């Protein structure tokens, strides 16, 4: 055996501990099991997938485009649809939407068709969720979107729709706990160049009252419910994908001039001034506010007429309830007087029959619809005041020569 052969095993034996040294250094650099568990626990707490309260809404740009298009195509009828997304630590991520069928009923047929349309919407939503799951798309309903015109949007159909979405999520096992969100898009402001998108959620007191199903006077007093605290507004932010941002940048940036070895002169720039791909909008300087004011005033008057009719119905039911209660109280007082007279004579008292079987005492009328109509009147009046104030400012500016 040569000397080189005898030296090779020794050098190999000396070089063998190197991997062990590298592994030891890697173990020393790696965190311990306790530290890793603490890091995992902190990460889970930071990314809580199910929170108690929705604090903000993050809306995808494509979903917003679908909402705006549906509301514009359905006008003058109101458009509604379902929101799909996920709750991430109190922030509701809305990634997709789909429209709900519009029954197209008139105001006179609203009471007769309300229950059937609600069932149809629930069945349609269930079928859409099932089909979306079949194609591995987002299929987690988290709320509704509603299109409105001139600010009035709160009605019983919206409340029933939120309750139906909440029941659907709870049935599927997601445990929403009444966290349905309502996205409202005002088409009137969008037509003027100001896209208005607001998000609301039901207040806890209204959720408790809705679970009990009682909205009479005493229930509203106990839960401290008015039209102003039925919904709680939450902030909305818009999120665009990188491709959408690139597309918007391409259509809003003026096209670059062609290659030229000669620098453009001042006369060329004056003859062909650079212009943006999107023309500037001067909608805010338009003085033709008469159609908008007329529409706002007409909408406010219509809602006031509906509220007057609803108040008349509630008043009639309240008077009928008072008459039946007065008859029942008179019957009980007469029976008690007769029994007192019989006891004074030493006779056995007569049994008192149930007044609910003798008299048709109706239930106390619900004041939910009247409260919602008050909210619509408030929204329409605010919108009318804003439009009138804008018109006064523009007319004053035109009078002084500023415009």
Swiss-Prot record:
A family per Pfam: eIF3h_C
Alphabetized GO MF terms: metallopeptidase activity; translation initiation factor activity
Annotated stretches, region: Disordered: 99-122
Disulphides: none
Keywords, sorted A to Z: Cytoplasm, Initiation factor, Protein biosynthesis
SUBUNIT field: Component of the eukaryotic translation initiation factor 3 (eIF-3) complex.
Official protein name in the record: Eukaryotic translation initiation factor 3 subunit H
């Amino acid at each position: 055996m040569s000397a080189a052969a005898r030296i090779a095993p020794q050098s190999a034996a000396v070089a063998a501990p190197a991997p062990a040294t590298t592994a030891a250094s890697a173990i020393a650099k790696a965190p311990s099991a306790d530290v890793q568990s603490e890091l995992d626990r902190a990460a889970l707490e930071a990314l809580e997938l199910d929170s108690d309260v929705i604090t903000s809404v993050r809306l995808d740009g494509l979903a917003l485009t679908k909402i705006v298009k549906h509301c514009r195509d359905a006008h003058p009828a109101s458009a509604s649809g379902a929101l799909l997304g996920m709750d991430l630590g109190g922030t509701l991520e809305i990634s997709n939407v789909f429209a709900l069928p519009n029954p197209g009923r008139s105001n006179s047929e609203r009471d007769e068709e309300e229950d059937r349309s609600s069932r149809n919407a629930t069945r349609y939503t269930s079928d859409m969720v099932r089909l979306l799951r079949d194609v591995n798309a987002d299929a987690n309903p988290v709320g509704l979107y509603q299109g409105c015109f001139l600010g009035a949007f709160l009605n019983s159909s919206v409340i029933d729709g939120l309750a139906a979405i909440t029941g659907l999520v709870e049935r599927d096992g997601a445990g929403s706990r009444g966290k349905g969100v309502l996205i409202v898009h005002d088409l009137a402001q969008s037509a003027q160049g100001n896209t208005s998108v607001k998000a609301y959620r039901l207040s806890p007191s209204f959720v408790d009252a809705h679970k009990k199903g009682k909205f009479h006077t005493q229930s509203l007093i106990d839960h401290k419910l008015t039209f102003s605290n039925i919904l709680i507004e939450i902030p909305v932010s818009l999120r665009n994908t990188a491709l959408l941002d690139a597309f918007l940048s391409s259509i809003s940036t003026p096209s670059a001039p062609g290659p030229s070895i000669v620098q453009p002169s001042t006369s060329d720039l004056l003859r062909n001034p650079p212009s943006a791909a999107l023309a500037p909008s001067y909608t805010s300087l338009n003085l033709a506010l008469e159609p908008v004011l007329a529409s706002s005033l007409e909408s406010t008057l219509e809602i006031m007429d509906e509220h007057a009719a609803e108040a008349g119905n509630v008043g009639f039911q309240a008077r009928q309830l008072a008459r039946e209660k007065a008859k029942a109280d008179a019957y009980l007082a007469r029976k008690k007087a007769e029994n007192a007279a019989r006891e004074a004579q030493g006779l056995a008292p007569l049994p008192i029959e149930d007044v609910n079987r003798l008299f048709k005492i109706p239930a106390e009328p619900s004041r939910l619809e009247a409260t919602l109509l008050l909210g619509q009147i408030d929204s329409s009046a605010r919108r009318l005041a804003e439009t009138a104030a804008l018109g006064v400012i523009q007319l004053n500016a035109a009078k002084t020569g500023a415009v």
